[in-house]
């Protein structure tokens, strides 16, 4: 999966609301472990360096949807200020006028941390009104909280319904490494699993069994498997209701040729306490009643090391024993050291979050692995192959199958001198754009002189209208032949203003489309519904009629040369804009319609632009949609904002 990241968007002067994971231990108002805060620093610093106004959201603990002083983020704000070397403003609220005022006063390069998101009951319920409020504070959402990626909450998933969401650097790294080991691991691939419950790891074992060469099982969960094999496990922790499942997993592994490696000895004791009597027993000899296995034994450590020795990819999730107590930590420590040694040899080594990450930190090995995940439950669900809502809500990098177009319709604006001056600026600023097409459509009076400036450049010349005859007694009209001679490559036909003001109908527009194609130019056929038609539920009917009649008489090859611009009439020049979801819905409908009229290959070749009050602050959410191939821009194409739109489009191209 390739997601958009914070690098792909222009942050200068933007309000960025960033979901981070500051769920850290706090005692007596002091942060005890700042690992998670440090993990978010690269993303925060980058946003500040780019001139963003940064608003941070995080939860801490489980305050049950209401303010609770012991879960306040005030101590986190203090620690973050120390780590950043600059003031972090803190608002002891998550919604309301106090929050709005603090955001309004925020300057470029400043940071604001809101109070614990879980002080509001709507956070964990993914309340759309709460998400909408947070979204209203910002231009873009950055999700850098992998630890909550398996939760659909308002601060990580809900906001993305209202403003574009991109990944921070930590989220990007998590996705990169976990995707590698889940979907495309280098062989030999060894999975090391531990922890208490088989039930917690069923999904991981089942999914990774399709790819792993060996699965090494330690921790308390090993005793459920050992009992399934008929071994005596004494008072060791066993999930009795999962014994049959353990048998099934062992059988399934055998069928798939995956080696399941279980411990051959264990460190046992009668109590889980420091300093108690302990001893090592072989599994085949059985663990006496009243004794429980609390760590893997020395023979198992050597066995696991040997099974790991040739690995090119290793995933480790779950400790080998009760590592929190030094008497039972050796197995976990030795396995950690063995995996760390493989990292030095070039293997990809990934440590799941939760207890595994805590163990790595205890042994001072946190920088000895390719990646140590910051999410326990999230990393487990990712390894199970599940789609995590906190990742699904991040905008995908656009997979380009059609060359995108950014077209500017200047309408009845700019004199010849103004047009020449502005197009010269565009040429200077956008001269290196090759990834997509840029088209400018000045008034007819400026076409020739603008065309001379654009000659041989990467920016294409377009016209705003045309008549369908080459010549004749048509006072005031411009013919396709005239446009062709000037060097025009694109021609807008059927714009809603011409349909409405000049009463152009579909038959008339169809004749224009054919005339433009005949002269080797590309028509941009505009379609779209009025507000009244939308409110009556007629959007698809109106658009279907306009598309069918606009394409009437065109064969497949001619159809492929037409560009469609969906412009909801109610959004043109009104400041209103279709939501990304509304726009995508109509674009998808048009593409499906084209496949019915022609075939899927033809429909997949035709570019469909969106037009309707496009501006830099709404363009990203539109352009990342699957079926939107660019924009036909009105007012924003007359100013330097057109350059910003081009930068936004550049950022989304994979």
Curated annotation (Swiss-Prot):
ATP binds at residues 201, 293, 317, 324, 353-356. Substrate binds at residues 21-23, 36, 59-62, 118, 151, 409-411, 572, 634-635. Its EC number is 2.7.2.3, 5.3.1.1. Pathway: Carbohydrate degradation; glycolysis; D-glyceraldehyde 3-phosphate from glycerone phosphate: step 1/1; Carbohydrate degradation; glycolysis; pyruvate from D-glyceraldehyde 3-phosphate: step 2/5. It comes from the Bacteria. One of its GO terms (biological process) is gluconeogenesis. The active site is at residues 495, 567. Residues 400-654 are annotated as: Triosephosphate isomerase. The keyword Lipoprotein does not apply. GO terms for molecular function: ADP binding; ATP binding; phosphoglycerate kinase activity; triose-phosphate isomerase activity. It is found in: Cytoplasm. Pfam families: PGK, TIM. It catalyses: (2R)-3-phosphoglycerate + ATP = (2R)-3-phospho-glyceroyl phosphate + ADP; D-glyceraldehyde 3-phosphate = dihydroxyacetone phosphate. Keywords: ATP-binding, Cytoplasm, Fatty acid biosynthesis, Fatty acid metabolism, Gluconeogenesis, Glycolysis, Isomerase, Kinase, Lipid biosynthesis, Lipid metabolism, Multifunctional enzyme, Nucleotide-binding, Transferase. CDD domains: Phosphoglycerate_kinase (cd00318), TIM (cd00311). Its main location: cytoplasm. Residues 1-399 are annotated as: Phosphoglycerate kinase. Signal peptide: none annotated. Monomer (PGK) and homotetramer (PGK-TIM). This is Bifunctional PGK/TIM.
